[in-house]
Amino acid sequence: MNMRLQLLSDLHFEFHRDHGRSFVSSLDPSGVDILVVAGDLEVGDGLPRALALLCERYRESLVAFVLGNHEFYGSSPAETCEMVRKAAHENPNLIWLDCSSIQETGSGRKRVLGATLWFPHYDSNPRAKACLTDFSAIEGFEPWVYEQNRRAVEYLAREIRPGDIVVTHHLPSPVCVAPQYVGSILNPFFVCDMTDVILDREPSLWLFGHTHSSMRTQIGKTRMLCNPFGYLGSMDVNMHFDKHFVIEA
């Protein structure tokens, strides 16, 4: 029996007047085994509320969540992580994937692994770095971000097995960059290239976010999927977002 996963990312409830309440009410949890939320859900104190809304709506499902970059804005990594730990304690169906995995029970059920992923250190030009809000909005961002990236890369390269489902916020391959962003000076902050790992370890699915463009592509035997919403009320909302996007795996 296949698992049914619903994929959402980059909901950015901080841009919603009601902080996502009406949006969550419009979602259909019927028959969903796992709701996958691939980061950038809400910022600051709004994050626990947003997680609770989704967990209540999907009370018969698991909610698998990886942190994006925006959840850390205006806070420290330690404070944000503690907020999510507390939310997972208060919502029994919430699973925070932080270099960790869940194994669904039952015949044919697959393992789901996840991490934010982030990006490796590289000698960027100052203009590119100045354009990325992460460096100014997240307290103690450097060198913390590079350690988190190293940790995630090592974990995924070591743990992924054929047929697994992987969830990250950041893009795991340059192949996943939308055509309009090819050549952008910001791509090194959006992509951590795991292409060799994908080809070698052969997960069945890799689900991601961060970019605000839908993506359906293939690397070897792995389907690469992204279903982001974007910023409500702006030019950066994804016109191809599908709030009913369900994958059978």
Residue ranges and their predicted role:
Residues 7-9, 35-40, 64-69, 95-99, ...:
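Active-site neighborhood of phospho(di)ester-bond hydrolases with catalytic His/Asp-centered motifs
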Residues 49-53, 79-83, 184-192:
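Charged helix-capping and loop-helix junction motifs
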Residues 111-184:
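Active-site-proximal loop/helix segment associated with metal-binding centers of metalloenzymes
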Residues 2, 92, 104-106, 178, ...:
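Binuclear metal-dependent phosphoesterase catalytic core
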Residues 75-98:
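Glycine/small-residue-rich loop that forms an oxyanion/phosphate-binding "nest" at active or ligand-binding sites
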Residues 1-65, 71-79:
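N-terminal active-site segment of His-dependent metallophosphoesterases
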Residues 1-6, 101-114, 119, 163, ...:
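Beta-strand-turn-beta hairpins that frame and shape the catalytic cleft
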